[in-house]
């Protein structure tokens, strides 16, 4: 998405009376890592120009799908929405996380992954990275409302992917899909060398129709509150246009969105690269977005202390990702403050190849492709999982 000019921003002080800080939300926000954001951005760049329907575009689609599977989502949670552009087939990717109380009411979190004229690390590798990191962190978090993480294609050719999804899925569902809010994240990479400490929050001011404007204004004010509550960024209020929330807006849905405040001139050019944007800004945008998505979907607010989280429960929550992996694996458990555990990797014969103490990132670059066993030990409890290394 490229904005031709920036709306005269309203500098307003948002009261937190309607929204209070939730420690459980912050604990999950704190699971966001700069290393993950950097990896997503640089991997996204390797696919080059991802023009809708191109081989690079399809390769990026497969990369996204494999990311979700590596996070631990099942194939049944992933769906595809295909359409044809210029004689080539291209696909939207939809990951659905079912809500515990309102399984048929959806919070849609979306952003496009197609690019034109360049690798599009800002437009929209940045939004893609934010969505990936949120999906990773929320994988095992109960939410009252269902969440759909959607990676759209065809945005750069006139919002074709999102329009196709509205036509063939949202309106084709019987009864019509019930959407609580659409939260679009597009071009949130900022500008290298500038102070990127503000994120633009976009509300619906379109009068065709106007019946969803008031609700959009309310939800965008909530979004701004979440920016202040869960990130170091400052919110800036503006208006929505020219990105994948617009087909939903025209359909009468409630929309909101993120867009960079310092607007880059690099999108839609070969210069839309990692070097020309600000990965730390993307990291901070992810924090703000994750706080907001938890609020919109009403995430579980339970927090566990070390005493409330016995070793067996910690081990039950063990996640090892990516899996399959190549050079590194990450270890994640329910108690993110745990500092006393051991981890080893053995081959099929039981020979210990890697032994680690209290490490959350394990170097496996020296291991050959194959099947291995990873064992985590906490006090007197052990859990073993199979991992696959693929070079």
Features from the language model and the residues they span:
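Sec-dependent N-terminal signal peptides
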Residues: 4-13
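Solvent-exposed loop/turn segments at secondary-structure junctions
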Residues: 49-52, 82-88, 99-102, 113-118, ...
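Active-site-adjacent substrate-binding region
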Residues: 191-304
């Amino acid at each position: 998405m490229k904005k031709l000019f920036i709306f005269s921003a309203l500098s307003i002080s948002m009261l937190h009376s309607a929204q209070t800080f939730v420690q459980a939300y912050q604990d999950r926000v704190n699971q966001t890592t700069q290393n993950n954001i950097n990896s997503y951005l640089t991997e996204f760049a390797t696919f080059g120009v991802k023009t809708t329907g191109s081989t690079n575009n399809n390769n990026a689609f497969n990369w996204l799908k494999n990311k979700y599977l590596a996070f631990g989502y099942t194939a049944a949670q992933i769906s595809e929405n295909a359409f044809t552009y210029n004689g080539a087939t291209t696909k939207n990717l939809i990951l659905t996380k079912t809500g515990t109380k309102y399984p048929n009411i959806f919070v849609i979190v979306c952003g496009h992954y197609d690019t034109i004229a360049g690798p599009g690390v800002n437009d929209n590798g940045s939004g893609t990275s934010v969505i990936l990191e949120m999906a990773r962190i929320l994988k095992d978090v109960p939410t009252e409302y269902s969440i759909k993480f959607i990676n759209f294609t065809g945005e750069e050719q006139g919002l074709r992917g999102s329009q196709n999804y509205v036509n063939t899925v949202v309106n084709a569902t019987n009864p019509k899909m019930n959407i609580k809010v659409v939260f679009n994240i597009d071009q949130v990479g900022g500008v290298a060398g500038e102070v990127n400490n503000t994120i633009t929050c976009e509300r619906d001011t379109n009068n065709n129709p106007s019946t969803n404007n008031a609700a959009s204004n309310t939800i965008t004010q909530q979004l701004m509150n979440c920016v202040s509550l869960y990130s170091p960024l400052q919110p800036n209020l503006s208006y929505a246009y020219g990105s994948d929330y617009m087909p939903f807006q025209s359909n009468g849905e409630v929309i909101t969105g993120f867009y960079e405040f310092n607007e880059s001139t690099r999108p839609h050019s070969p210069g839309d690269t990692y070097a020309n944007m600000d990965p730390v800004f993307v990291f901070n945008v992810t924090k703000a977005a994750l706080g907001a998505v938890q609020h919109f979907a009403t995430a579980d607010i339970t927090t566990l202390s070390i005493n409330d989280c016995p070793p067996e429960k910690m081990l039950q929550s063990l996640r090892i990702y990516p899996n399959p992996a190549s050079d590194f694996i990450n270890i994640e458990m329910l108690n993110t403050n745990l500092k006393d555990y051991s981890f080893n990797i053995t081959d099929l014969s039981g020979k210990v190849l890697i032994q680690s103490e209290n490490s959350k990132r394990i170097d496996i670059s020296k291991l050959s492709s194959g099947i291995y066993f990873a064992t985590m030990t906490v006090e007197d409890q052990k859990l073993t999982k199979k991992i696959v290394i693929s070079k």
